[in-house]
């Protein structure tokens, strides 16, 4: 898949008309879905589930405050989702929804009216831009809404979305549940435009549920104007050091007097850091008492700043659902609502994953297979990565077997140590070699170092998205120790929660022919020594390889399950290839793009590869699942859970291979999948749905069809015999035939004898 610097969507969406029809359908069974939602006692002020508030609609995908963004929010969220509108006033006193006082920040106004930029004092700061109060509503219809955050996709900027009045939004959506945010009442008052007068007028035709503002005087003006059944007033806190413009007090000082806030508001809206602050390294520190204090004062607490495509605390492992749960279901308190650019994720967190323990009933059955353990949280293939994968709920942990020069099989993702080890080049630069059979560039390969040397190395966490400045768990970037295959198998035996282990074997032919190392036999011997071949453990063993010859060799010598990995991205698989695979494999691994192909990170459709393999009784496992939003197609809303749902509930795969086992394991306990009516925020995506609502001029380039996988791609000659290799000594290290540590697999006796007799002949 093409990596991208931002965000995605879900659901069956084909056109604007279908979007509107979907809104009607949501209303038809909203009551039924609401009745099915969790009735657990929430620690909110009133005991109800936290509200999901869609900031500008679904602004994480579509331009903020566009009709399409509001429609998509209603389609993919809880039935009572509240739609947020940043209220601005035009020159002719009409109210529009727009996210910023400067219209140029999320529209094309600067291209249409390049000479109408002006300067104003906004809260005492001279600000240049294009301001709503300088344009009539008619003039505002001459330019288009576009993304306001440049890191997000620009593919919907050409869809022709216009600025909407509040009445437009209400009429189009035909629903209640609106939150009007008045960010700059004092500014508009200086321009002789009255927010309070407009709100009183529009409230006669529009149902307003919430009104928020960061200005105290605004609330003092409108208090008592709406009557008993009027909207809920919510005071918005900005940065603690920022000054509230009408009292000249910092928001931090106002926070210390919540009883004062209670005199004019029923709730507060605060940034996430007010409740769960971070330290300088982006890790969580203990939560504040703000929620409990506000609830004691009778104030509801709403939290802003939620988006799937921004950096979050490292504690969440790039999983936005985990972040929401830390605010709504942490055992100490629940906030009363969350303001999100991605309301689908907030909806799922609140309704599908809250109040679910680790022992909750599983609603769906598939294998969670680790990739080098929990390698998104710790250096891969270390003891800590494997232990966390088991703790996080992996069904199967994996070991990519490499061989040391002294014949010890151990776990490491790559045969080139530089890909997994810190500061390796400085220590063993003299071991760098060129091996065209393995890599087009020189490397420091595992078979060039002894096992004691490898044990002395410092592992390094992988950072596959470094180019986007997205890093993994820096505090633990070098934690843990590498372990041998024997240690890996011993670890797996001690956990009854594991159903199996997956052992990956690659480069077997090269190791036999050029290094005199028989990785197949080394794996078999180690399994026997660990008790996996004689029935002393019930843990299932799966052997994986991209080489059919390797799996054929294992099949001849053992009864372990074999898994054939198809490296290529394929669009179809021929019957003859499937029949050939069935001769030596019990299951197949394919990559994500072989299920859902994409163009420029937009799904283009779905292949029949999974269906064809499963019809031939071959389970299908898919890799590689990661939590970082840049690893996912836009269609998945920058949410790893939405992606998993598409592959499990949508494509019906049999297992996920993931660097973040916790996210996949939690999905199994997804409460919403056990309901008679699955809610819209847990329906699988429609592959290609986003392309169908994209302007033809904005479509990504068409991709050539992925290849068919044929029998010739499967068939390989048998593995060559092991070639005896004369022992060599590395500088300052023991001979490569030195005895392996106790408990580790040694070189086969036959190989040692061959080397001995060869040396006699050379004398």
Swiss-Prot record:
One GO cellular component, as annotated: membrane
One BP term from GO: glycerol metabolic process
Record keywords: Cell membrane, Glycerol metabolism, Glycoprotein, Hydrolase, Membrane, Repeat, Signal, Transmembrane, Transmembrane helix
Extracellular side: 36-744
Membrane topology, as annotated: Single-pass type I membrane protein
Tissue-level expression: Expressed in rosette and cauline leaves, stems, flowers and siliques.
Main location group: membrane
Ranges per topology, Cytoplasmic: 763
Limits of the GP-PDE domain: 50-350, 366-668
Transmembrane segments: 745-762
Places the protein is found: Cell membrane
Job of this protein: Hydrolyzes glycerolphosphoglycerol, glycerophosphocholine and glycerophosphoethanolamine in vitro.
Protein name per UniProt: Glycerophosphodiester phosphodiesterase GDPDL1
Required cofactor names: Ca(2+)
Family label: Belongs to the glycerophosphoryl diester phosphodiesterase family.
Its EC number(s): 3.1.4.46
PROSITE patterns listed in its UniProt record: GP_PDE
Signal peptide start-end: 1-35
Pfam family, one: GDPD
Glycosylated residues (UniProt): 105, 192, 248, 257, 315, 359, 430, 534, 547, 654
Example of a GO MF term: calcium ion binding
Family annotation (SUPFAM superfamilies): PLC-like phosphodiesterases
């Amino acid at each position: 898949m093409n990596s991208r610097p931002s965000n995605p969507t879900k659901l069956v969406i084909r056109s604007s008309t279908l979007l509107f029809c979907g809104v009607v359908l949501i209303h038809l069974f909203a009551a039924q879905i609401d009745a099915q939602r969790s009735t657990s006692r929430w620690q909110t002020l009133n005991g109800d589930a936290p509200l999901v508030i869609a900031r500008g609609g679904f602004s994480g995908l579509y331009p903020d405050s566009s009709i399409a963004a509001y429609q998509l929010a209603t389609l993919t969220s809880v039935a009572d989702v509240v739609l947020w509108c940043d209220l601005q006033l035009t020159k002719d006193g009409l109210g529009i929804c727009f996210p910023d006082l400067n219209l140029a920040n999320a529209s094309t106004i600067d291209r249409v009216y390049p000479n109408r930029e002006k300067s104003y004092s906004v809260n005492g700061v001279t600000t240049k831009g294009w301001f709503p109060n300088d344009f009539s509503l008619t003039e505002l219809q001459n330019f288009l809404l576009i993304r306001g955050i440049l890191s997000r996709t620009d593919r919907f900027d050409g869809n022709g979305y216009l600025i909407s009045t509040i009445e437009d939004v209400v009429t189009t959506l035909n629903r209640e549940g609106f939150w009007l945010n008045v960010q700059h009442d004092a500014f508009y008052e200086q321009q002789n435009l009255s927010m309070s007068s407009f709100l009183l007028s529009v409230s006669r035709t529009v149902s307003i549920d919430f009104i928020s503002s960061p200005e105290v005087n605004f609330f003092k003006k409108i208090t008592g104007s709406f009557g008993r059944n009027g909207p809920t007033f919510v005071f918005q806190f900005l940065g603690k050091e920022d000054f509230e413009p009408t009292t000249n007090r910092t928001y931090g000082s106002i926070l210390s007097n919540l009883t004062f806030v209670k005199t004019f508001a029923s709730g507060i809206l605060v940034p996430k850091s007010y409740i769960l602050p971070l330290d300088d390294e982006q890790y969580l520190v203990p939560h504040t008492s703000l929620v409990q204090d506000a609830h004691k004062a009778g104030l509801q607490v709403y939290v802003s700043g939620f988006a799937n495509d921004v950096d979050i605390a490292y504690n969440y492992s790039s999983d936005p659902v985990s972040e929401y749960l830390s605010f709504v279901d942490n055992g100490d308190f629940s906030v009363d609502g969350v303001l999100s650019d991605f309301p689908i994720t907030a909806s799922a967190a609140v309704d599908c994953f809250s109040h679910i323990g680790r022992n909750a009933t599983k609603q769906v059955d598939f294998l969670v297979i680790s990739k080098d353990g929990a390698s998104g949280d710790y250096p891969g293939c270390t003891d800590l990565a494997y232990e966390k994968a088991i703790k996080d709920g992996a069904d199967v942990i994996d070991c990519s077997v490499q061989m040391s020069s002294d014949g010890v099989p151990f776990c490491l993702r790559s045969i080139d140590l530089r890909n997994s080890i810190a500061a390796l080049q400085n220590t063993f630069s003299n071991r760098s070699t060129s091996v065209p059979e393995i890599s087009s560039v020189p490397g420091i390969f595992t078979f060039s170092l002894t096992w004691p040397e490898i044990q002395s190395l410092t592992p390094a966490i992988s950072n596959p998205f470094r180019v986007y400045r997205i890093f993994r768990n820096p505090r633990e970037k070098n934690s843990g120790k590498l372990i041998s295959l024997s240690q890996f198998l011993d670890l797996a035996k001690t956990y009854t929660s594991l159903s199996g282990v997956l052992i990956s074997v690659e480069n077997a032919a090269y190791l036999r022919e050029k290094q005199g190392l028989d990785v197949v036999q080394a794996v078999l011997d180690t399994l026997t020594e660990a008790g996996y071949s004689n029935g002393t453990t019930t843990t299932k063993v799966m052997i994986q390889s991209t080489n059919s010859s390797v799996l054929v060799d294992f099949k001849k010598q053992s009864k372990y399950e074999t898994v054939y990995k198809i490296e290529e991205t394929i669009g179809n698989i021929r019957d003859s290839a499937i029949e050939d695979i069935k001769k030596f494999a019990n299951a197949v691994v394919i990559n994500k793009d072989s299920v859902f192909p994409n163009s420029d990170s937009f799904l283009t459709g779905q292949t029949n590869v999974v269906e064809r393999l499963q019809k031939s009784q071959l389970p299908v496992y898919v890799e590689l699942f990661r939590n970082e939003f840049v690893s996912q197609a836009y269609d998945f809303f920058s949410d790893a859970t939405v992606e998993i749902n598409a592959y499990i509930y949508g494509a019906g795969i049999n297992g996920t291979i993931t660097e973040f086992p916790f996210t996949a394991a939690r999905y199994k306990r997804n409460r919403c999948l056990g309901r008679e009516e699955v809610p819209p925020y847990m329906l699988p995506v429609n592959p290609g749905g986003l392309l169908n609502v994209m302007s033809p001029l904005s479509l990504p380039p068409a991709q050539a069809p992925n290849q068919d996988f044929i029998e010739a791609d499967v068939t390989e000659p048998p593995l060559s015999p092991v070639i005896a290799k004369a022992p060599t000594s590395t500088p300052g290290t023991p001979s490569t035939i030195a005895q392996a540590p106790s408990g580790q697999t040694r070189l086969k006796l036959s190989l040692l004898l061959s080397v001995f007799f060869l040396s006699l002949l050379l004398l």
